[in-house]
Amino acid sequence: MMQNTTVPILSLLNSRFSPKEFLQEPVSQEHYKLLFEAARWSPSSYNRQPWFYYYSLQNTPGFETLAKSLVEGNAWAKKAPLLILGCYIDSDEHGKNAYAQYDLGQSTFSLVMQAQALGYYSHQMGGFDREKAKTLLQLPPEHIPHVMIAIGKIGNIDKKDPSRTRKETLAKKVE
């Protein structure tokens, strides 16, 4: 599904959107390993790589555990073949990392774009109970849950949310 952009952009970016309908087609081990490899090679401040992901495939106990932390409005994500919880690590042996959340975002974007290149779509969500996720998954204290990602082949796009308009102005030249 191509968007109407004001200037041509990469087709991978142009076709990206966040569906709420996924086909019940599993994500292969080869493919989800590629997603995490793409995330691994993301840039990060001082190469600290302050991200960690927890993932599970549909119809497994781990998937049910991840899904339990979703808010009611994101119950649709339980139909995705793959759920991923992205965490940032805000301090390490070098001290506090003020860019940890930003770096997790870059890593997650790399993961999402790799998924897109493989023919999958993803939907990133903040709508989940972070404390519940920490408790249910027994996360180490330094792993701070920040984003949940549903990934799969796109389902019935006729059911998708109507597209939202994009900002007309998002940058200003400084002279």
Show where each model-derived region lies:
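C-terminal helix-cap and adjacent tail motif
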Residues: 4-5, 9-11, 18-19, 26, ...
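Small-aliphatic-rich amphipathic alpha-helix that forms the alpha element of a beta-alpha
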Residues: 39, 84, 93-136
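A glycine-rich helix N-cap at a beta->alpha junction
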Residues: 74-79, 83-85, 139-162
